Amino acid sequence: YELRLDGRRKKAQAAGEELNRATLDANEQLRRAKLLEDLERNLEGFAQSVKAVMKEAGRGMLTGVCGPVTKLLSVPREYAVALETALGAAMQNVVVESEQDAKKAISLLKQRDLGRATFLPLTTIRGTVLDKREMEELPGFVGIASELCRCDPKYSGIRDSLLGRVAVAEDLDSAVSIAKRMKYRFRIVSLDGQVVNAGGSLT
């Protein structure tokens, strides 16, 4: 009788453990579904390829994906237009840990015919920052674009590579004046999003 009772106890215990596992699995699935739902909402306006990469990273199918550039930078409101203009399409570039991670993501996009995306591996991207000393005394100079936003230190190389050689001016007149003084060597963006390009063209 004791053996039979012990057997029943073990069966009940096993059934309880199985139920706990099933509950945990169900909770995990709900958690992942919620994460993907939030991700979808947060990626409104992004290209299909970028959304696909972020979804697969959320599912654990891609590793080393840090996120789109725009999600990794913190920009004060007063500089938002200027920095968005300076970044342009690069806002949707995807930062990854390594070249291997980039290759896997590119392969996935190609296999599923989901378009293209640009990947920025932390292991290879390095940036240089303009020397602002010559410009600091010029009327209308605001700063170097890379210094007007914040990010985790691990992304500073990415930030500097995209924004380190862009100056920000108060308005288009100031931008043109500074560009002339600096011999049109680099881009200058005004706070309202006008651009004096390297070489002298205006956008």
Give the role of each language-model region.
Residues 28-203:
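Hinge-like oligomerization/junction regions that interrupt long coiled-coil arms in large cytoskeletal
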